Amino acid sequence: MEQIFSKLEFITSGEGFIDITNNLNLFIEKNNFDSGILNLTSLHTSCSLTINENADPNVLKDLREYMQSIVPYNSYLTLSKSREEISYKHYQEGADDMPAHI
């Protein structure tokens, strides 16, 4: 099977969701692919790739609220029965990077 490697870059302005479906479709169309496997990798630790439906905007609201509840900006709750709140120990890269690394 033929393989092609390419780099797609996306500029962001901080926390949020970016729909890259059209970018991927254009990449596939530009390269005249009929079939194959598309493997996506993020080279930045503060980024995640997810697959979600895009019909209901409340899905992204729910996902954002859920992520903020399990990995908040300033501290997190332990998974023990006591649910102790613990501050992050790594902070050198700024408040927005602390939860992003978890």
Question: What do these predicted regions represent?
Answer:
Residues 1-102:
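Active-site histidine-anchored catalytic micro-motif
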